[in-house]
C-alpha cells in the first residue's frame, strides 16, 4: 500500500473528512514521526510496533560497478519492530 492509497482508503472510511484533510493529517503524522526519530527518540504504537534507530558500524564495502573497496562511515538507520498483535494478525494466514 502506498501513501496515496492509504489516504484514499482513510478518506473513504471517514466520509465526513475531505481527502485533502486526510492527506494533511497523514503527512503531519509522518513528518512528526520522522522528526522524533531524527531527535534520537523511540516511537511506540501499542499493538502495532515500535520504530527506533539502529547504529550501523563503519565497514569496508565494494562499489558494485567497479568492484573497488570503499570505506563506509557508521550511520543510524530506521528500524521497525512489529508488536505481538500485528505479528499475530499477519500470521493468521500461515496456519
UniProtKB/Swiss-Prot annotation:
Membership in a protein family: Belongs to the bacterial histone-like protein family.
Quaternary structure note: Heterodimer of an alpha and a beta chain.
SMART domains xref list: BHL
Keywords for this protein: DNA recombination, DNA-binding, Transcription, Transcription regulation, Translation regulation
Record-given protein name: Integration host factor subunit beta
Primary role: This protein is one of the two subunits of integration host factor, a specific DNA-binding protein that functions in genetic recombination as well as in transcriptional and translational control.
NCBIfam families in UniProt: hip, PRK00199.1
UniProt-listed InterPro entries: Hist_DNA-bd (IPR000119), Histone-like_DNA-bd_CS (IPR020816), IHF-like_DNA-bd_dom_sf (IPR010992), IHF_beta (IPR005685)
Superkingdom as given in the UniProt entry: Bacteria
Disulfide-bonded cysteines: none
GO cellular component: chromosome; cytosol
Name of encoding gene: ihfB
GO molecular function: DNA binding; structural constituent of chromatin
Amino acid at each position: 500500500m502506498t501513501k496515496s492509497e492509504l489516504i484514499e482508503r482513510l478518506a473513504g472510511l471517514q466520509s465526513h473528512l475531505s481527502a485533502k484533510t486526510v492527506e494533511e493529517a497523514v503527512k503531519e503524522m509522518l513528518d512528526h514521526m520522522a522528526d522524533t526519530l531524527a531527535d534520537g527518540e523511540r516511537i511506540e504504537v501499542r499493538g502495532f510496533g515500535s520504530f527506533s534507530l539502529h547504529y550501523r558500524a563503519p565497514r569496508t564495502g565494494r562499489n558494485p560497478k567497479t568492484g573497488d573497496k570503499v570505506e563506509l562511515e557508521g550511520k543510524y538507520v530506521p528500524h521497525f519492530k512489529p508488536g505481538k498483535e500485528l505479528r499475530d494478525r499477519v500470521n493468521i494466514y500461515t496456519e
